[in-house]
């Protein structure tokens, strides 16, 4: 994506929905069918070919990349998302920052969907005054949209400090 700061938007946002909405013209002009959103603080090494193939095969509206972890480290400053998954990989529930996670399926902070789905979700949320894509859109749409998890078995690290940045880059 281009920088969120534009002639019409000075870079002060009310949240992720506002930020995505500010670059919607760029997104609409893109010829790509799919959009993949990834956080800037997560480190992993993968291509998305298998994730895209599963997304198409399952007919998912949204696919989340996840890995299997034990406990969340309390010193990590970013949101932790845990998924309840059916046997076929369909997301049946999402927990945000659970104190006692009920599942080992932890988000890698990557979400994929068709560009038209993303455009609709952002425009709809923006028109209602929603601010956070995770809380106001994804968490609320679990039973409404067809969401699946794609398991990633490689190394995943969450950068929350300068030493963490170096350690995760060495480990990747």
Task: Place the predicted regions along the sequence by residue.
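Unchanged
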Residues: 1-170
């Amino acid at each position: 994506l281009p920088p969120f700061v534009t002639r019409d938007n000075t870079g002060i946002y009310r949240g992720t929905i506002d930020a995505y909405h500010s670059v919607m013209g760029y997104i609409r002009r893109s010829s790509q069918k799919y959009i993949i959103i990834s956080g800037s603080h997560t480190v992993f090494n993968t291509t998305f070919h298998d994730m895209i193939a599963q997304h198409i095969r399952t007919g998912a509206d949204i696919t989340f990349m996840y890995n299997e972890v034990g406990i969340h480290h309390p010193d990590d400053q970013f949101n932790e998302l845990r998924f309840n998954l059916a046997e076929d990989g369909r997301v049946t529930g999402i927990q945000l920052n659970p104190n006692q996670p009920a599942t080992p399926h932890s988000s890698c902070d990557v979400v994929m969907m068709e560009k038209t789905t993303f455009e609709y979700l952002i425009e709809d949320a923006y028109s209602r005054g929603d601010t956070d894509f995770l809380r106001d859109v994804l968490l609320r749409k679990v039973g409404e949209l067809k969401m699946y998890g794609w398991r990633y078995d490689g190394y995943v690290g969450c950068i929350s400090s300068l030493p963490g940045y170096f350690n995760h880059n060495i480990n990747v």
